[in-house]
């Protein structure tokens, strides 16, 4: 009769730590939400909807109104994150080919090999692609980076993030190996940031403009992307191991089996979207739509792709519960916040517009 070995949490944790050590992405994202997916493939995230501040009015008569200004109820935006990736393996060890006892040590060796060659590259590739697709900032460069242009291009992209109030620090510059030479041979690389005793993730050659530099194999780097900057609080990559077990004396064969299944995904946090920025190839970014509001209607003009919009101020680029496909002028009322974006097949998504309806 077959005997099933359900590996302990301690062994699973050790495997996760090994993956993190090898991964080029595991150090870069926020793990705070990981536990929310422990019992579900879907998590609804509520983010506070902020509004403009009031000016305190000392001349206001308290009997007729508040000196603090108009009272506005705090609202929120709901976004839905769903794990879409579901990978598995079912591997056998025939007793005629391997006389070693099937145990934790043996299964660990098998999983180590698959982690190195299959699991880690697939997860890293997917994460980078998904974060790049959902990034809040996409900048199309006129030409591919060179030794004389790459430093300015990186600084400009980082500045675009800071101009959107993205805090400095906890950021990683991901760059394809194709363009690492251009960066490291640039004159400014000689003035590399002092690490100040900071320990860098494995494989990172240094820091530049306050960012950890993480070279990535061109084989797993997103297409039409030269480099990208991701701030830790802006990106997540939840996963959960559904099955991890060994079956001794399996039926239909003289040997043992190892079964593994893992669900995972990667997302950009909508309220932190500007903390993910991508330098793209020319002509690969969907143009941002233009919006005209008049006569109680919002009219959108877009040259490419499908336009999505919201009326509550939530970001239509993400899994907003309020997002709808635009087909004709939309009725709006005072207080609505009309936002829209365009998504075209084979291109990076556009920026999101922001129009507050005041009349």
Task: Label every PLM stretch briefly.
Residues 1-80:
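N-terminal "assembly arms/tails" that initiate or stabilize quaternary assembly
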Residues 2-5, 15, 32, 36-41, ...:
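Signature of extracytoplasmic/envelope-associated structural regions
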Residues 53-56, 91-92, 182-185, 269:
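Short helix/loop capping segments that flank catalytic or ligand/cofactor-binding pockets
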Residues 242, 246-288:
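Extended, compositionally biased alpha-helical segments that mediate assembly or anchoring
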Residues 39, 44, 161-246:
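Extended oligomerization regions of viral-like shell subunits
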Residues 70-108:
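Long, hydrophobic/aromatic-enriched structural stretches that serve as scaffold segments
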Residues 281-359:
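Short, compositionally stereotyped local motifs that mark structural "simplifiers"
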Residues 94-164, 279-282, 336, 359:
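Alpha-helical scaffold segments that mediate packing/assembly in large oligomeric complexes
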């Amino acid at each position: 009769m077959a005997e099933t070995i359900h590996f302990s949490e301690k062994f699973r944790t050790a495997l996760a730590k090994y993956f993190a050590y090898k991964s080029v992405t595991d150090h870069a994202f926020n793990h705070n939400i990981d536990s929310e997916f422990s019992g579900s493939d879907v998590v609804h995230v509520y983010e506070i909807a902020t509004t403009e501040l009031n000016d305190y009015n000392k001349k206001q008569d308290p009997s007729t109104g508040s000196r603090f200004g108009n009272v506005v109820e705090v609202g929120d935006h709901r976004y839905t994150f769903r794990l879409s990736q579901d990978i598995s393996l079912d591997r056998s060890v025939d007793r005629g080919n391997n006389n070693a006892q099937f145990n934790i040590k043996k299964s660990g060796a098998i999983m180590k090999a698959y982690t190195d060659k299959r699991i880690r590259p697939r997860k890293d590739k997917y994460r980078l692609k998904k974060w790049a697709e959902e990034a809040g900032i996409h900048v199309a460069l006129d030409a591919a980076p060179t030794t004389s242009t790459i430093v300015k291009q990186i600084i400009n992209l980082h500045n675009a993030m800071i101009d959107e109030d993205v805090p400095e620090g906890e950021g990683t510059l991901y760059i394809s190996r194709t363009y690492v030479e251009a960066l490291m041979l640039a004159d400014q690389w000689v003035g590399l940031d002092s690490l100040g005793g900071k320990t860098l993730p494995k494989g990172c050659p240094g820091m530049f403009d306050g960012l950890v530099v993480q070279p990535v194999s061109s084989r797993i780097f997103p297409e039409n992307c030269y480099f990208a900057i991701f701030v830790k609080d802006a990106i997540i990559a939840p996963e959960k191991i559904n099955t991890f077990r060994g079956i001794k004396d399996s039926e239909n064969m003289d040997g043992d089996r190892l079964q593994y299944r893992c669900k995972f995904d990667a997302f950009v946090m909508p309220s932190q979207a500007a903390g993910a920025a991508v330098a793209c190839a020319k002509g690969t970014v969907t143009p941002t739509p233009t919006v005209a509001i008049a006569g109680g209607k919002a009219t959108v003009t877009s040259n490419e792709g499908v336009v999505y919009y919201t009326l509550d101020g939530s970001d239509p680029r993400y899994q907003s519960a309020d997002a709808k496909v635009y087909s004709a002028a939309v009725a709006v009322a005072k207080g609505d916040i009309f936002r829209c974006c365009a998504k075209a097949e084979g291109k990076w998504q556009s920026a999101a517009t922001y129009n507050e309806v005041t009349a």
